[in-house]
Curated annotation (Swiss-Prot):
One of its GO terms (biological process) is regulation of DNA repair. Disulfide bonds: none annotated. Modulates RecA activity. It is found in: Cytoplasm. This is Regulatory protein RecX. Belongs to the RecX family.
Length: 153
């Protein structure tokens, strides 16, 4: 299969829409049918212009997920792994942002935004489980959730 454009042009087109990790960009170019030499050359050029930077991508992605409350702790690490970010880079990005974001504040904001009328003490078991599981899927530890809901009043 002969590609219509070169890998460099395709990489630029992809990066003009959104940020990619290097591994994700490599996968996208492979799906487009480019051979490994073309892909490596395109990625090298992207790195030289700083268009692809896994550290920057990990920080941006982690900041977005933390700010929105979509992932914390293990869920955040799992998301970065899913985006093909190496563990050491992901851990560094998460550690750098720990000072900026407090899990307690993220939890409080998320609960106020997502469940404004929820009261853990008066809620029935089904509602408690629903809210608790929603927050667990976002990476909050059970101990943190129990502490938050016991101090909520």
């Amino acid at each position: 299969m002969a590609p219509r454009t070169d890998a460099w042009s395709s990489a630029l087109r992809l990066l003009s829409r959104r940020e990619y990790s290097e591994a994700m960009l490599r996968e996208r170019l492979q799906r487009k049918g480019f051979d490994s030499d073309q892909i490596e050359h395109a990625l090298e050029r992207c790195r030289s212009y700083n268009y692809v930077n896994d550290e920057r991508f990990a920080r941006i992605r982690a900041r977005q997920l933390l700010a929105s409350g979509r992932a914390v702790g293990p869920a955040l690490m799992a998301d970065l792994r899913h985006q093909r970010i190496g563990d050491s880079i992901a851990r560094k990005a998460i550690n750098d942002l720990e000072e900026e974001f407090s899990q307690a504040e993220i939890l409080k904001d998320l609960c106020q935004r997502r469940f404004p009328d929820f009261d853990f003490q008066t809620a029935d078991d089904r509602s408690r489980r629903r809210v608790f599981n929603y927050l667990r899927r976002r990476g909050f530890a059970s101990a943190v959730l129990f502490q938050y809901f016991s101090e909520e009043r």
